[in-house]
Amino acid sequence: IGGCLKKGLSRGRWTLFGDFSMQAIYAEGVSGTKLIEKLDDITSFIRFKLTVNCRNTKPICKEIETVTGFKAPHDLWTKVDGPPVQYLTWSTMESQCKKLKAVLKQLADSHIEPGKITILSPRKREDSVVSMLDGYVVKDFSVSPGMNTTFCTIQAYKGLENSVIILADIEGFSAEKLMYVGLSRACTGLYVLESDSAKREYDNLLMRRLFNE
């Protein structure tokens, strides 16, 4: 960043927004505090804490809590209600493809614009169920807004959002930060295509949350 900024980070003018805890997916073993301290070593700056989640609906926030264990004070979560998060379980890539097509058809029947739908996966496109889709136009995500449904890896979509997110190729929930990023990209509708083993893992996570309430 410093190389792109006139006078660099130390002397230039900049504003940085960041989630240095749950979305620091490339900083394994380094805490959010340590990341900010690294910036402190370069320059001085004013800190301002954002305290309200303006993106996700209450059901999505609840699923984030269930899957990742991340529990923010409830007054910081959004007050906006929305549809429940939908989980669809698959046993083979073929069955996952059928379920993905069913979701896309359901959204089309509900008159959801294709451009408001993004499919996210922990896998690259060639290894994802998206590569098996036929009869649907799914473009690779680009910054320029388009009219088509888009695909992107969860990692590359960090910091972005869309009205409807479909998480595909989910075979487990142990990568908590990655799952946090994926789940929290959705503004309104969230669908999760999970494997049989991921379903069992999710059931255990749900029990953990219920016992802790």
Residue ranges and their predicted role:
Residues 1-213:
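Conserved helicase motor core of SF1/SF2 NTP-dependent helicases
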